[in-house]
């Protein structure tokens, strides 16, 4: 267990129960979720309505396999590309709640790609991971076609889990492609699915399609990372929020250790004051701690 003192795994794997905000509300865990949905959707609307940012609506597959690419009239053709993968335990959320991070990045000269994906139980987690591999191939084709100068990827929560596949797909991410990747940012992710596979709160009626046969193959913490040297020029940041559960924090800490021991340039950061949700909400604020962190990655 990542939290040996835990007496309620369902609660430890449910991030909204660990916020210190909205304590004046009858159910803070619901209030933090409602606030997240409302604020992040507002951030998305304001990009085009108030900030003069342009968006191209693209597709990499069927169903919800969509990509929105944001930029401004000042964005150069060779601008670096920042790719964001949303969370939601592979079964919730969508692109409309995934654009908080866009504004400050576009103002700093980036193009920003926000991707969506098919959700469980319409697909199993194994199928979703295969579809995400198709997305990786698509986004690298896009960068090569548009002459992008460099890439940074960030995934939040379940999106961080999906993003981990980039390190395990040498047939898609060639050595030449990996050299384009400036940084990988794993935000508040879950990387070992063994504990949560039987939790009704996270995997009701096994909508993720987990079993003894596939549990290790869908758990990045347990993978054998062998193609490490092609990532020598890429920095990896594994990030946790102070007001997330002990299980989430320790999964992130342990995942950073796993990557370092394999030879990746990986670091672990615990963000003080943030919970699982406002660490994303505040990416919309140019001078927030998390925005400064993202800005510093550019120059490290």
Swiss-Prot record:
Q: Which UniProt keywords apply?
A: Hydrolase, Tryptophan catabolism
A GO BP entry = L-tryptophan catabolic process to kynurenine
Q: Which InterPro entries match?
A: AB_hydrolase_3, AB_hydrolase_fold, GDXG_lipolytic_enzyme, KFase_ver/fungi-typ
Got any disulfides in this one, which pairs?
none
Q: Where is this motif: HGGXW?
A: 86-90
One annotated GO molecular function: arylformamidase activity
Q: Which SUPFAM superfamilies match?
A: alpha/beta-Hydrolases
Task: Give the main EC class.
Answer: hydrolase
- Origin: domain of life: Eukaryota
Q: Domain comment? A: The main chain amide nitrogen atoms of the second glycine and its adjacent residue in the HGGXW motif define the oxyanion hole, and stabilize the oxyanion that forms during the nucleophilic attack by the catalytic serine during substrate cleavage.
Which proteins does it associate with, and in what oligomeric form?
Homodimer.
Q: Which family does it belong to?
A: Belongs to the kynurenine formamidase family.
- Its name, as the record gives it, is Kynurenine formamidase
Native source organism of the sequence: Drosophila melanogaster (Fruit fly)
Name the gene for this chain: KFase
């Amino acid at each position: 267990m990542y939290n040996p003192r835990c007496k309620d795994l369902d609660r430890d794997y449910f991030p909204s129960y660990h916020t210190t905000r909205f304590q004046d509300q009858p159910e803070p865990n619901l209030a933090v979720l409602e606030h997240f949905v409302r604020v992040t959707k507002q951030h998305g609307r304001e990009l085009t309505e108030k900030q003069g940012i342009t968006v191209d609506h693209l597709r990499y597959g069927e169903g919800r396999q969509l990509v929105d690419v944001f930029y401004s009239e000042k964005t150069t053709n060779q601008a670096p590309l920042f790719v964001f993968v949303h969370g939601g335990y592979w079964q919730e959320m969508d692109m409309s709640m995934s654009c908080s991070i866009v504004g400050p990045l576009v103002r700093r000269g980036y193009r920003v790609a926000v991707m969506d994906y098919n959700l469980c139980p319409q697909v199993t987690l194994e199928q979703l991971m295969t579809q995400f591999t198709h997305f990786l191939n698509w986004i690298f084709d896009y960068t090569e076609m548009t002459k992008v100068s460099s890439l940074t990827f960030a995934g939040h929560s379940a999106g961080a889990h999906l993003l981990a596949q980039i390190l395990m797909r040498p047939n898609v991410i060639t050595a030449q492609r990996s050299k384009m990747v400036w940084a990988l940012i794993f935000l508040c992710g879950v990387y070992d699915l063994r504990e949560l596979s039987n939790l009704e709160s996270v995997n009701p009626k096994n909508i993720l399609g987990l079993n003894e046969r596939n549990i290790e193959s869908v758990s990045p913490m347990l993978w054998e990372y062998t193609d490490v040297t092609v990532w020598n020029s890429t920095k990896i940041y594994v990030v946790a929020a102070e007001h997330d559960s002990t299980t989430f924090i320790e999964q992130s800490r342990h995942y950073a250790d796993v990557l370092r021991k394999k030879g990746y340039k990986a670091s672990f950061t615990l963000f003080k004051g943030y919970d699982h949700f406002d660490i994303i909400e505040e990416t919309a604020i140019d001078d927030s701690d998390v925005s400064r962190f993202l800005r510093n990655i550019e120059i490290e």
